């Protein structure tokens, strides 16, 4: 659910430019201002500055630790190390709680109010919902409150800073994701191949059936034509019986008749 970082880059760039020429207490003051600044929720570039890293070896090391905590940590991390860290202003406290919500949202699509109340050390539901609404308006998360089931349903959240030591894990996760995609693609290709084979076999069978039907039609047509011719011939024979020749009187009969007449 983690998404691209929302606009805070211009303001952060201004702080980075100021920090490059700053040291000592002036730098710690600048860090405090960055941690309070509205819209600034990523701190990796500031942490990479050499003079900021130099704070680790001086009296102001706690401010470097605090900056690291805002970059990678959560509100429970601050509470666990509160004694060794500078005290937070109200604005810084709310921002760290917002970042804690982002961290939870990157792992869970539906965050129970009970989890939020525990991690943010809040007891009042109304205050919790107001804090969530603030986070939504700052565009670091998108979602809705399910008051009936007491859930925060997350649709989107920004991405937080990434430690260098975590990059290998991210690369490993991406490789696993790519392997999974390749396996899915291979499965789809096999299904397409089977579908094409089925289609080809079906088409071949259909052609065979059509050829057989055509042959049967031709046979039936030829048989019907032959039967019709035979029937016509039989009808013709019935309507026209064979002609019998009449006997012609012979000359002997005529002679006999002449003899009879002469005797009279």
Swiss-Prot record:
One of its GO terms (biological process) is protein deneddylation. It comes from Mus musculus. Residues 2-159 form the PCI domain. This is COP9 signalosome complex subunit 7b. The modification N-acetylalanine is found at residue 2. Component of the CSN complex, composed of COPS1/GPS1, COPS2, COPS3, COPS4, COPS5, COPS6, COPS7 (COPS7A or COPS7B) and COPS8 and COPS9. In the complex, it probably interacts directly with COPS1, COPS2, COPS4, COPS5, COPS6 and COPS8. Interacts with EIF3S6. The keyword Membrane does not apply. One of its GO terms (cellular component) is nucleoplasm.
